[in-house]
Amino acid sequence: MIKTLAKQIKEYKSASLVTPIFMILEVAMEMVIPLLMASIIDDGVQAGDMKHIFAIGCYMILAAIVGLFAGVMGGKYGAKASTGFARNLREAMYENIQTFSFSNIDKFSTAGLVTRMTTDVTNIQNAYQMLLRMCFRAPVSLICAMLMAFLINARVASIYLVAVVFLGIVIIFIM
């Protein structure tokens, strides 16, 4: 079944591959901003260095703009890939329905076929978009947050690491 669905991605493979890249960039920018804020407080405010505050503030604005751009582009390409995937899937279903014999047409109701081509495909489309966006965003967020925690304070981050491993084990047993 997955092979059948994967065939419908066709010309949307590039959009499907670009979406996670933009999501990774967006998450990286989201994780850099608190680190820059810490630098402003630790090195700028406490020392009274206005040049440092201004410079790091400019980097924060740049990181926010890059993160916003990456988020918008990730959303755009994710939507393009998922809607194109759904369109191809509906087209393939329609072509398959056209080959039905009269006995098959009598077996499936028109309402059932319409539901399959609309609601079910829309659900698959939404699942594909969530796969493109969230299945990459969550692990990358975890990795970037862990990295930032170790950059700030490795001793405290080790507690975070133990908690993440514990939660991972619990989640595996729940599933």
Where are these regions (language model features)?
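Alpha-helical transmembrane segments of multi-pass membrane proteins
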Residues: 15-16, 63-82, 133-140, 161-175
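Transmembrane helix-loop-helix hairpins at lipid-water interfaces of multipass membrane proteins
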Residues: 10, 16-73, 77, 150-155
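Hydrophobic alpha-helical transmembrane segments of ABC transporter permease domains
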Residues: 21, 25, 29, 33, ...
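Short intracellular "coupling" helices and adjacent cytoplasmic loop segments at the cytosolic face
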Residues: 47, 83, 91-115, 119-121
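A short amphipathic helical element positioned immediately N-terminal to and/or at the very start
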Residues: 1-16, 113-117
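Alpha-helical transmembrane segments of polytopic integral membrane proteins
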Residues: 34-38, 75, 90-94, 111, ...
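Hydrophobic alpha-helix/TM-entry signal in multi-pass membrane transporters
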Residues: 4, 15-20, 56-60, 108, ...
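Short helix-capping/hinge motifs at transmembrane helix termini and TM-loop junctions
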Residues: 46-47, 75, 82, 101, ...
